[in-house]
Regions:
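Bacterial N-terminal signal peptides that target proteins for export
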Residues: 1-8
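GH16 jelly-roll
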Residues: 25-294
Length: 294
């Protein structure tokens, strides 16, 4: 081998050593980040509430009748008109066109009664049944369609001291959305906007009764609404983390500590505008659970 060939080989060996060192240096610097992520992903959770909807369990849920958001339906108890059904291992909450206008006994927070309506709907809550501080809430659910005008199904949380109907305990005296009556929306579909789309996020309190910022902490995502998905929110340190099928899609950074109170879960299917509908709309829920970190 000539001297020039020896020089070329030495140059190549030195270059390879340099690249190897830099690669090892890069891997060493990344390792703590990867370890931290894996530690969070593998963190154990323990289930302290699970409803698989083999039946409608009144130890877990109660019907709610209230008029909010200028909704055009009437919430009815006991699954009247087929608005709430448990069958084949799942809960079905519905909006039903009954075919004729009927009196409605729902009232808004100012005592105004809902006008007669031909639309009946189901709304249930774990209020005074299953209430938890922080942790993680998840529901596996789907809609019967990809979305229609006026549809407004939701899976969400509300502070346990909320002063809206039904008021059953002395400490239920805090107005929405102040601390104690805060709101976190895990899944909402606004049918007037677009199909196969939902929004998720917290409502930011503006420090007064009935004064909430609906949009600054919320984000919309595409999803196939008529297929089952798992929608969740969890408290991670001071953040609220939103997931679909276990994958993080959104995060309210630093907002978790603004919701320190016990919260209960709500499932409801609303009709939000005067747009006509026929037959029934269905939200099907396979299960609901709450977990806490061990």
């Amino acid at each position: 081998m000539t001297i020039s060939n020896y020089s070329l080989l030495s140059f190549l060996l030195i270059g390879m050593s340099f690249v190897s060192c830099k690669t090892q240096e890069k891997n060493d610097s990344m390792e703590p980040i990867e370890t931290k992520v894996n530690a969070l992903e593998n963190e154990d959770w323990e289930v302290d509430f699970l409803d698989n909807f083999e039946s409608f369990n009144t130890d877990n849920w109660q019907d709610q009748r209230i008029w909010v958001n200028n909704e055009t339906h009437c919430y009815v108890p006991g699954g009247a008109f087929g608005t709430r059904e448990v069958s084949d291992g799942s809960l079905k909450l519905k909006v039903v066109n009954t075919g004729e206008k009927r009196p409605c006994d729902n009232f808004d927070k100012n005592g105004k009664q809902h006008p007669e309506t031909q639309y009946a709907a189901g709304r249930i809550a774990t209020k005074n049944k299953k209430e938890f501080i922080k942790g993680k809430w998840t529901a596996k659910l789907k809609l019967a369609s990809n979305g229609e005008a006026s549809m407004f199904p939701a899976w969400w949380l509300l502070g346990a001291q909320n002063n809206e109907s039904p008021v059953q305990e002395p400490d239920e005296n805090i107005c929405w959305p102040l601390t104690g009556s805060g709101e976190i929306d895990i899944f909402e579909h606004h049918g007037d906007h677009q199909k196969d789309h939902f929004t998720t996020g917290a409502i930011k309190s503006l420090g007064e009764c009935d004064k909430g910022d609906w949009w600054s902490l919320r984000k919309g995502f595409d999803v196939t609404l008529n297929e089952y998905h798992e929608y969740s929110v969890e408290w991670e340190d001071s953040d609220l983390v939103y997931r679909v099928d276990g994958k993080e899609i959104y995060r309210n950074v630093g907002e978790g500590d603004n919701y320190p109170e016990k919260m209960f879960a709500i499932l409801n299917f609303a009709k939000i505008t005067d747009a006509p509908m026929k037959g029934e709309w269905v939200m099907e829920v396979d299960w609901v659970k709450h977990e806490f970190r061990k």
